């Protein structure tokens, strides 16, 4: 895995513009926050290695509010305030690590604080400001990510992370209409291997194709995330939520493995049998698999 390098420069606004001062990173002296950012860097390395993160593809947002001490809360903005595009009342005063727009996952894996930033949601719940380490503008999919974070807080969930990526096999399946109807894709993926049932027990939700970065796509995703931890955007990619970024990655990875098994079987010339409905129910019952989000 790539080494993780902490950014040491911060841009402090002064009269007349921005001046760069060499200062310590927000991660220094905050081991909890540093561990979260290092985990994000680790996951982005996996995304690149799997071929899910071409160029600057994919986005990550993680709630890091619990690690913000009084010094962090007093940090000034280092870039102009930006509008989110919607009002999200649960996010007032919350802090998030966000991947930067146009930034590559493979670069974030090595330099997380040069390819992402810590943002603070303003008191109007409709705008945000960057506080560290550098004025890296967040992902263009920020409205979707923050809408999901708002929902998670509203429902009292312990989930902190949202991940958008482009898993090859799952995106390929979204080009086939059969898999976009009802719960057909979930049924097929669950039937490929018992671990899919065990580690992605809420299946996968389907969102019809929508314009990337649009509020409409965010709203459609929010509806599906109420019942699923992983949502597939038709002909685009997945959005996953999890207790941390590794959890969101793992659920996506498990579903993609099942899709790969399905395609391997199809490449042998036959439609795979899959586990029977009875066999899948037995797995669910014996292992008492959850039908709702665990927290």
Per-region residue spans from a language model:
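Residues marking helix boundaries in flexible regions
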Residues: 13-15, 23
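Glycine-rich flexible loops
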Residues: 21-295
């Amino acid at each position: 895995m790539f080494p993780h390098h902490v950014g040491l420069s911060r841009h402090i606004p002064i009269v007349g513009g921005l001046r760069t001062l060499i200062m310590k990173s927000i991660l220094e002296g905050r081991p909890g926050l540093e561990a979260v950012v290092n985990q994000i860097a680790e996951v982005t390395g996996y995304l690149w290695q799997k071929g899910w993160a071409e160029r600057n593809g994919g986005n990550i947002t993680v709630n890091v509010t619990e690690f913000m001490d009084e010094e962090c809360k007093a940090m000034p903005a280092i870039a102009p305030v930006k509008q989110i595009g919607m009002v999200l009342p649960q996010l007032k005063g919350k802090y998030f690590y966000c991947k930067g727009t146009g930034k590559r996952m493979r670069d974030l894996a090595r330099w997380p604080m040069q390819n992402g930033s810590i943002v603070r949601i303003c008191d109007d719940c409709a705008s945000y400001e960057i506080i560290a380490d550098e004025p890296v503008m967040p992902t263009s999919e920020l409205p979707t990510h923050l809408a999901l974070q708002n929902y998670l807080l509203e429902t009292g969930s312990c989930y902190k992370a949202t991940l958008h990526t482009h898993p090859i096999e799952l995106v390929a399946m979204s080009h086939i209409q059969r898999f976009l109807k009802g719960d057909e894709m979930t049924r097929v993926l669950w039937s490929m291997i018992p671990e899919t049932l065990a580690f992605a027990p809420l299946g996968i939700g389907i969102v019809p194709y929508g314009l990337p970065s649009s509020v409409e796509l965010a709203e459609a995703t929010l509806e599906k995330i109420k019942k699923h931890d992983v949502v597939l955007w038709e002909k685009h990619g997945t959005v996953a939520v999890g207790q941390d970024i590794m959890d969101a990655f793992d659920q996506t990875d498990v579903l993609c493995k099942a899709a790969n098994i399905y395609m391997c079987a199809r490449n042998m010339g036959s439609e795979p049998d899959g586990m029977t409905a009875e066999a899948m129910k037995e797995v669910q019952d014996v292992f008492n698999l959850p039908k709702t989000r665990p927290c």
